[in-house]
Amino acid sequence: MNVKSIALSAVIATSFLAAGAMASEKTEPRNEVYKDKFSKQYDSWHATDESKEVVDMLEKVPSLVVLWAGYGFAKDYNAPRGHMYAVTDVTNTLRTGAPKNAEDGPMPMACWSCKSPDVPRVIEEQGEDGYFSGKWAKGGPEIVNVLGCADCHEKGSSKLRMSRPFAERAMTTLNTPFDKASRKDKQSMVCAQCHVEYYFEKTAERPGFVKFPWDMGTTVEQMEVYYDSMEFSDWTHAVSKTPMLKAQHPGYETWKLGVHGQNNVSCVDCHMPKVTNDKGRKFTDHKVGNPFDRFEETCATCHSQSKEFMVKQVEESKQKAQDLKARVETQLVKAHFEAKAAWDAGATEVEMKPILMDIRHSQWRWDYATASHGASSHAPAEVLRILGTSLDKAADARVKLAQLLGAKGVKQPIAYPDTSTKAKAQAALGMNMKTMNAEKAEFKKTLVPKWKEEAKKREATYK
């Protein structure tokens, strides 16, 4: 190449950089780019920031600390907020630790997977192998835009898409591939990219990859068999030594089991209805929320009953589930501590195995029924059924434990520690919350600002 050619190449390269790089061929993660073209949708989506309140669920239900002993949720668990807080909340939670650099911290990259349209952007740029490799902190400078347009829509379009390849594979597993689905089905499938049960693989070929456990089906029993068949556990319980499963948020699976799912009423129909603006134009309201807040556009399009009647029905279903949920939690807390007493008394692994399996199955079913949040509305009968089987499993475990403790000469009832508050429960487990909170504060003060600065510089190169 001669001098003139080299000079010309340099000019072309410089011009390209000056013009800016594309965010991604398929994904524009910056939600504000769509503000003008889709103004009504953008403004309503932005209104999800109104759910500002942080509700500490461990304060409200201290038994959760014991149920998740040894797992990150025992440190910190708040009620979910609007989509606008997805990145903020995963950054602030104690569950993601206080990493000091990109290679540090307790959690994998997969923890970002449902938080941002930057996730599909990075997957497109690096492949799934590149995206899923490494620690959660590696993604800090990359995953900065909150859940929004590109998570559910094709670039520059209102057309729906599956932006996560692991979710697309899961739909194919159910013989319902996204590209063959109706628009009505797609309106729920895009939500099912995140509002589902999933786990992080532990295989050598796909370490830390997100997978939906749907190979045998989507019911609580089918997924239980799936997990048991490969002896998978999310963690070992710090008190009972049970190989535990942590349900995420199986909203899609429980919706499918209820009257709405079985009649093809989509997530969008109830949570993102068509509304009319002040100019008389209809659009899809992207302020994802409670259907009762927009009753005339949601429930009233199918139901003839009054809002008051419908609210009462839902509240009664919710209360029944809450009452049964609390009973299960009481039994499981005691089962975990009784299992510890059995171990301390010299119980063997052979003696404990069936007991731990009962505890595992009971808590998995309890978590499946409650972690999906809206399941008592989506599938109230199924939730009560599942919680009933959970209570049975917890009772089975405690009966076996009573027999084993008696055989070991342990006086019953055993002495249970005071777990009546979040602080007392965490103290009973030996958790140093003062240190954890101080480390988290330092992380937010030192590393997070660097992430934001790196992201700002990167996005400044985009067109």
UniProtKB/Swiss-Prot annotation:
Its EC number is 1.7.2.2. Heme c 3 binds at residues 83, 191, 194-195. Substrate binds at residues 198, 249. Ca(2+) binds at residues 197-198, 246, 248. Keywords: Calcium, Electron transport, Heme, Iron, Metal-binding, Oxidoreductase, Periplasm, Signal, Transport. Heme c 4 binds at residues 267, 270-271, 378. Belongs to the cytochrome c-552 family. Heme c 5 binds at residues 260, 299, 302-303. Catalyzes the reduction of nitrite to ammonia, consuming six electrons in the process. It holds the Pfam family Cytochrom_C552. It is found in: Periplasm. It comes from the Bacteria. One of its GO terms (cellular component) is outer membrane-bounded periplasmic space. Residues 1-23 form the signal peptide. Its cofactor is Ca(2+); heme c. CDD domains: NrfA-like (cd00548). Heme c 2 binds at residues 149, 152-153, 286. Pathway: Nitrogen metabolism; nitrate reduction (assimilation). One of its GO terms (molecular function) is nitrite reductase (cytochrome, ammonia-forming) activity. It catalyses: 6 Fe(III)-[cytochrome c] + NH4(+) + 2 H2O = 6 Fe(II)-[cytochrome c] + nitrite + 8 H(+). GO terms for biological process: anaerobic electron transport chain; nitrate assimilation. Heme binds at residues 111, 114-115. Binds 1 Ca(2+) ion per monomer. Binds 5 heme c groups covalently per monomer. This is Cytochrome c-552.
